[in-house]
């Protein structure tokens, strides 16, 4: 190694699965590492990159970090592919079969992105479901760190999949959904079959989705280290189980508030770090400004969930009939097929005008922190769950698929900061749950949510567990320089 290279910063390659929630989490990690003066090459799909440039401040946000660079790559899907609903799973075989070979070629041709001012890749931080990135790292002798963008509880349940199959809990065929699952250590008293990750709801253990999940999760242990976007006070008992298999585990979350904390520590102006693939309609913030404190239920099912027209109408009637104010995010592509083009009943339109507001996409972090928000009807995606926890906002959980099923169980049964409405979509239940959250048990839920928000803030403040773990991660990466 030349003396010039000796003085160069560590160079980290970060590679997320190209869907919004994963890209968002790993962009925040990238910025946290930039603040520690590490060089970052961020692999991003061409589709994701174009959406980020069009709809967010990502260009100006990272312009202040000269050591950061995007490296676009194809995700193998046509631009008009929906990348939502069940079809979002198409991204896994596509990235493996198309992106994988392109990535390998890119790394070889670019000499691991080294230059006169940038050392070759020090380590690869890959999304935990991109095993081909791990294969390349092992082949080239590059240290590998996996970032799992899901909750610790979801990762651990997936890790225990061989035991779940052996015990007969998987595949879930529709019967016995409320039976307690005994083969996930640490969850033996409260985890039901219906709470297992959505990919477990298959008729055959050879189902490709199930096999991908099983394979990708178990291979995580080959990495030298792993990162989770969570914090010790939230998932400590489950983290203890994971550390038996992966002792070098860095919990650095909630990453969005951790980033804010670090920027404030360095007296850097905080830019709202949206990673949205859709244009945000900020008119909803003006509407919230005119509402009483803690009076509005925020409704958003994330970047992937799609609903049928029947489900849409049940939610809509439930919200209107509850008598509560609501702000509802309805993505343009969130209604299945042509269902969304049908006529909306007049009574729903009138009820919405009186107490509701609807937008195609919202600045969620800002909305959840608005004083008018009193509850969050959510799909229980992990980023949304953490954002709600940080904001001290109780939740009604209507999980759609994947890790969301188990997240919603923890929200209701373990953390007790909300209600679980999974596998139900009728207006009477929605009315009942909305009133329970926003009226009947409002003070109880707000008190618990406020306590959890304080724990989250402590974790990312100087001396907190996540703050210390990020410092430890940076030190570990620096130690990898040969």
From Swiss-Prot:
Signal peptide: none annotated. Its EC number is 2.4.1.323. Keywords: Glycosyltransferase, Transferase. The active site is at 22 (proton acceptor), 127 (charge relay). This is 7-deoxyloganetic acid glucosyltransferase. InterPro entries: UDP_glucos_trans, UDP_glycos_trans_CS. UDP-alpha-D-glucose binds at residues 149, 362, 364, 379, 382-384, 387, 403-404. GO terms for biological process: (-)-secologanin biosynthetic process. An anthocyanidin binds at residues 22, 402. It catalyses: 7-deoxyloganetate + UDP-alpha-D-glucose = 7-deoxyloganate + UDP + H(+). PROSITE patterns: UDPGT. The lineage of its organism: Eukaryota, Viridiplantae, Streptophyta, Embryophyta, Tracheophyta. The keyword Transferase applies. It comes from the Eukaryota. Iridoid glucosyltransferase acting exclusively on 7-deoxyloganetic acid. No activity with 7-deoxyloganetin. Catalyzes the fourth to last step in secologanin biosynthesis. Belongs to the UDP-glycosyltransferase family. GO terms for molecular function: 7-deoxyloganetic acid glucosyltransferase activity; quercetin 3-O-glucosyltransferase activity; quercetin 7-O-glucosyltransferase activity; UDP-glucosyltransferase activity.
